[in-house]
Curated annotation (Swiss-Prot):
Induction: By type I interferon or viral infection including zika virus infection.
Modified-residue entries (ADP-ribosyl aspartic acid), positions: D87
A Gene Ontology molecular function term of the record: NAD+ poly-ADP-ribosyltransferase activity
E.C. no: 2.4.2.-
Subunit structure: Interacts with PARP12; this interaction plays a role in zika virus suppression.
Effect ascribed to mutating Y38A: No effect on subcellular location at the nuclear envelope
Subcellular location: Nucleus, Nuclear pore complex
Job description of the protein: Mono-ADP-ribosyltransferase that mediates mono-ADP-ribosylation of target proteins. Plays a role in nuclear envelope stability and nuclear remodeling during spermiogenesis. Inhibits the type I interferon activated signaling pathway. Mechanistically, mono-ADP-ribosylates beta-TrCP/BTRC to promote IFNAR1 ubiquitination and protect BTRC from ubiquitin-proteasome degradation. Additionally, acts as an antiviral factor by cooperating with PARP12 to suppress Zika virus replication, independent of IFNAR1 regulation or intrinsic PARP enzymatic activity.
Modified residues (ADP-ribosylcysteine): C56, C72
Similarity section: Belongs to the ARTD/PARP family.
Protein name as annotated: Protein mono-ADP-ribosyltransferase PARP11
Organism from which the protein derives: Homo sapiens (Human)
Residue ranges of every copy of the PARP catalytic domain listed in the record: 123-338
Stated consequence of mutating Q93A: Loss of subcellular location at the nuclear envelope
Length: 338
């Protein structure tokens, strides 16, 4: 199921409150066949209907039966990703995982009212995301150091670095970048005709001045640097945190910031600074040894369409990966360490 854009939600709610309720009351006769609809991300009303994609557990008919039993009550249902509750009194649906709401309506059923898959609907967000705010470009959610999620990230870092150096780990929640990544993954699976694409969690070290830009726009080697581009002109990732740490800089922005607050450049050592490293989800797919001249992965068969997905330092034991398409990357975690 999909989340509605907040601005669209409020506009539709205002229009809906002026028209639909009166129309429903006037037309509520015993021989009317009613359907139940939700306001989709595309701005159109889609009918509730079980389907193989979302695995929705409730149908329009189920909702109507519940409504007739108790017009001021509610009904709960699930999809493959989330649990929901429909409130008949409010005529709204709430995602019990994220807390997000969207409008629903009861309207006369017609053949044209059947639901359909809209091409520009949003892809469901990961179920472990929390307090999602769709009105900001991204969110940094601090992970508690006792959680499984924190320890999973810290253990990957700790394979080649001392995990006690970690100051904090934050989850990056960027719906736009997540959708781009998911659509790219689906595209590659369709192109290859395979059920899964080779995907790895890889590290990327960078200067602190680029952190916010990466969280908003994703990685861009033209801006973030390419560290020599030995294996191609793309974004570089490493299997080992120790390697990526070589490119992390605790360059505070910058000397002027301290001077404005009355701190001299000589006193900067009194302030503890931290370095930043990303742990990204990367679709490495099919890879080949890289070359400094590559602007994109080379062809598998000499054609212009059948290309590798990424380049590496050594196909037998890859430690460095180069990705040329940002949509193959989702910057998932930001690790601050000293």
């Amino acid at each position: 199921m999909w989340e509605a854009n907040p601005e669209m939600f409020h506009k539709a709610e205002e229009l809906f409150s002026k028209t639909t309720n009166n129309e429903v009351d006037d037309m509520d006769t015993s021989d009317t066949q009613w359907g139940w609809f939700y306001l989709a991300e595309c701005g159109k009303w889609h009918m509730f209907q079980p389907d193989t994609n979302s695995q929705c557990s409730v149908s329009s008919e189920d909702i109507e039966k519940s409504f007739k039993t108790n017009p001021c009550g509610s009904i709960s249902f699930t999809t493959s990703k989330f649990s929901y509750k429909i409130d008949f009194a409010e005529m709204k649906q709430m995602n019990l995982t994220t807390g997000k709401q969207r409008l629903i309506k009861r309207a006369p059923f017609s053949i044209s009212a059947f639901s359909y898959i809209c091409e520009n609907e949003a892809i469901p967000m990961p179920p472990h995301w929390e307090n999602v705010n769709t009105q900001v470009p991204y969110q940094l959610i601090p992970l508690h150091n006792q959680t499984h999620e924190y320890n999973e990230v810290a253990n990957l870092f700790g394979k080649t670095m001392d995990r006690n150096r970690i100051k904090r780990i934050q989850r990056i929640q960027n719906l736009d970048l997540w959708e781009f990544f998911c659509r790219k993954k689906a595209q590659l699976k369709k192109k290859r005709g395979v059920p899964q694409i080779n995907e790895q969690m890889l590290f990327h070290g960078t200067s602190s001045e680029f952190v916010e830009a990466i969280c908003i726009h994703n990685f861009d080697w033209r801006i973030n640097g390419i560290h020599g581009a030995v294996f191609g002109k793309g974004t570089y990732f490493a299997r080992d945190a120790a390697y990526s740490s070589r490119f992390c800089k605790d360059d505070i922005k910058h000397g002027n910031t301290f001077q404005i607050h009355g701190v001299s450049l000589q006193q900067r050592h009194l302030f503890r600074t931290y370095k930043s490293m990303f742990l990204a989800r990367v679709l490495i797919g099919d890879y080949i040894n890289g070359d400094s001249k590559y602007m994109r992965p080379p062809s598998k068969d000499g054609s212009y369409v059948n290309l590798y997905d990424s380049c590496v330092d050594d196909t037998w034991n890859p430690k460095i990966f180069v990705v040329f398409d940002a949509n193959q990357i989702y910057p998932e975690y930001l690790i601050d360490f000293h």
